[in-house]
A protein has these predicted regions:
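Short amphipathic alpha-helical heptad-repeat segments
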Residues: 1-6
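Secondary-structure edge/capping motif, primarily at the C-terminal ends of alpha-helices
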Residues: 9-16
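Acidic, metal-coordinating catalytic segment for phosphate/diphosphate chemistry
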Residues: 19-65
Length: 173
């Protein structure tokens, strides 16, 4: 409910023209940050950075992930913290789902790909713990490799194709 209060406050701040209502919506936003801080055990200042710096109508953040298959195995990249994930990341401003997926695969896996089609949408907070203070919609895109090869970089230290039974590796959330 803290996120719902944040959403209501953000929408109110976006559309109100009344100065008194603006003050009320700002207070609702502060209360939502205080609640989230208590629930999450994160410092209030960190929560305020997430909640109170947003402007405009609040929407979920968008993340793309590339589904790349070879010989009935899926490509994963090893992140700097030792966890593994499908190549991908936040959709940058001015990028489309397709262009962001292609860009992220090149950056993280060193591969040139064609983004073929969207194969799944995933609400991160419904399926992963702990929930984020904001909503994330993950878009999974089927990709075909055209070329390239992996080189360690600032985001990833390894890549490989893995059996679809992923129970043996530590997957990032």
């Amino acid at each position: 409910w803290a996120k719902e209060l944040q959403f209501i406050a953000q929408a109110g701040l976006t559309y109100t023209k009344d100065l008194f209502d603006k003050e009320r919506f700002e207070r609702i936003r502060e209360i939502s940050a205080e609640i989230m801080s208590l629930q999450s055990k994160l410092p209030l200042s960190e929560i305020k950075d997430l909640f109170c710096n947003e402007t405009g109508f609040q929407t979920p953040k968008l993340d793309t992930r590339a589904a790349i298959f070879k010989d009935n195995k899926i490509l994963l990249v090893e992140e700097n913290d030792g966890t593994w994930s499908m190549p991908g990341g936040w959709v940058d401003v001015m990028e489309t789902v397709k262009s962001n997926t292609v860009k992220e695969v090149k950056e993280e896996a060193g591969l040139d790909v064609d983004a073929v089609r969207v194969i799944a949408l995933h609400d991160r907070n419904l399926h992963n713990q702990p929930p984020y203070a904001y909503n994330v919609c993950k878009v999974f895109v089927l990709c075909k490799v055209k070329g390239g090869c992996f080189h360690p970089n600032i985001e990833t230290v390894g890549s490989g194709y893995f059996s679809l039974d992923l129970s043996l590796i530590h997957i990032s959330e």
